[in-house]
């Protein structure tokens, strides 16, 4: 399993616009092989920005890489600079990718996953 995250520092007076942009966008992720789930997270408020993070779970790292080379990726990111997105941000977004090495479920089951 692979988790891809992007951190966004959103200007305080643009939080509503940022949230609406994400909540109203059409996602093609469910059509992409290897996609598991997506979450948009709202984090702590800082002095000059609100922290948000997108959290996408992929079956494998290879599935994530294939998505980054797909039409679905290009389509989703072609609009990334539209809707005044840069004026919403307190700086560029920051990508973070993680290989899952352990999984613990609510039923108590635990799985160790070989690091890739």
State the predicted function of each range.
Residues 3-8:
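Active-site-flanking beta-strand signature of metal-NTP-handling nucleotidyl enzymes
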Residues 9, 41, 55-57:
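Short hydrophobic/aromatic beta-strand micro-patches
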Residues 2, 39-48, 78-116:
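Glycine-rich beta-strand-turn "strand-cap" elements at beta-sheet edges
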Residues 14, 60, 70, 105-107:
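Serine/threonine-rich low-complexity intrinsically disordered regions
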Residues 20, 24-36, 51, 57-96:
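An amphipathic, aromatic/His-enriched active-site/gating alpha helix that lines ligand/cofactor pockets
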Residues 10-18:
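Short, surface-exposed ligand-recognition loops at beta-strand->loop->(often short) alpha-helix junctions
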Residues 14-15, 26-27, 31, 42-45:
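Intrinsically disordered, low-complexity segments enriched in polar/charged residues with Gly/Pro
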